Amino acid sequence: MVVNIEVFTSPTCPYCPMAIEVVDEAKKEFGDKIDVEKIDIMVDREKAIEYGLMAVPAIAINGVVRFVGAPSREELFEAINDEME
């Protein structure tokens, strides 16, 4: 099963680059086992509204917001592994 990860960011967000970096590391580690979509809320506001997001960065895994703020590498990898079980 492929784990779907959505990363919500905005151009003015100071913590978003850290969240993107951690997700990029996960993509390198997990490869085809995860599918990553990066969403700029200034461009695709509807998706953020669907999730009820009030802040970025935010990371949804398989349709559930798991992190608001940039998670550590360990936190993200653990959440991905939980979804794979």
From Swiss-Prot:
Signal peptide interval: none
One Pfam family in the UniProt entry: Thioredoxin_3
UniProt KW keywords: Cytoplasm, Disulfide bond, Electron transport, Redox-active center, Transport
Ranges of residues in domain Glutaredoxin: 2-85
Localization per record: Cytoplasm
Major site of localization recorded for this protein: cytoplasm
Record's GO cellular component terms: cytoplasm
Recorded GO MF terms: electron transfer activity; protein-disulfide reductase activity
Disulphide bridges: C13-C16
Biological processes annotated in GO: cell redox homeostasis
Family statement: Belongs to the glutaredoxin family.
Function recorded in the entry: Acts to maintain redox homeostasis; functions as a protein disulfide reductase.
Entry protein name: Probable Thioredoxin
Provenance organism: Methanothermobacter thermautotrophicus (strain ATCC 29096 / DSM 1053 / JCM 10044 / NBRC 100330 / Delta H)
